[in-house]
């Protein structure tokens, strides 16, 4: 019977584990027992210091691969022994199938991919430090964040007065 299982992997190795499982299925002629292997991802926007943007993929569930498989003990041990596989998720060291609700939520999240999100997000009222431009080294409060144009409207305190400024989000850093 085909069920969904979660496999814990080394973080960042999800795609290589997926490929290793596909190779295992092809090499051992068991492709009919493995119906689907997924690594849910989302698109994010990364901005370099020179304000160049690129869209990259990031795993929604770092360190996990989901597999729909007709699992028996032999296949379980073969998959478990693949490089970068930590374990199947389950109780008492035995794999436990995911519930329909859990896998439904994962698949829905994967299928409802929105527009790429910025890697760094600023919230209204957040305090940031300006790192470039005439207001470098000033602290400011975020009033508005325009994700599409990657601009921030900030309030900077200059000589005791709040002064509104608008700058690119690459010109500020979060204060931790």
Curated annotation (Swiss-Prot):
GO cellular component: cytosol
Limits of the KOW domain: 125-149
Pfam families registered for this protein in UniProt: NusG
Keyword Transcription regulation: yes
Gene3D superfamilies, alphabetized: 2.30.30.30, NusG, N-terminal domain
PROSITE patterns: NUSG (PS01014)
BP-aspect Gene Ontology terms: DNA-templated transcription termination; regulation of DNA-templated transcription elongation; transcription antitermination; transcription elongation-coupled chromatin remodeling
Alphabetically ordered keywords of this record: Transcription, Transcription antitermination, Transcription regulation, Transcription termination
Domain of life the protein comes from: Bacteria
InterPro entries in the cross-refs: KOW, NGN, NGN-like_dom, NGN_dom_sf, NusG-like, Rib_uL2_dom2, Transcrpt_antiterm_NusG, Transcrpt_antiterm_NusG_bac_CS
NCBIfam families per UniProt: nusG
Family: Belongs to the NusG family.
Function as written in the Swiss-Prot or TrEMBL entry: Participates in transcription elongation, termination and antitermination.
Entry-linked PANTHER family: RHO-INTERACTING TRANSCRIPTION TERMINATION FACTOR NUSG, TRANSCRIPTION TERMINATION_ANTITERMINATION PROTEIN NUSG
Protein name: Transcription termination/antitermination protein NusG
Name of the gene encoding the protein in the UniProt record: nusG
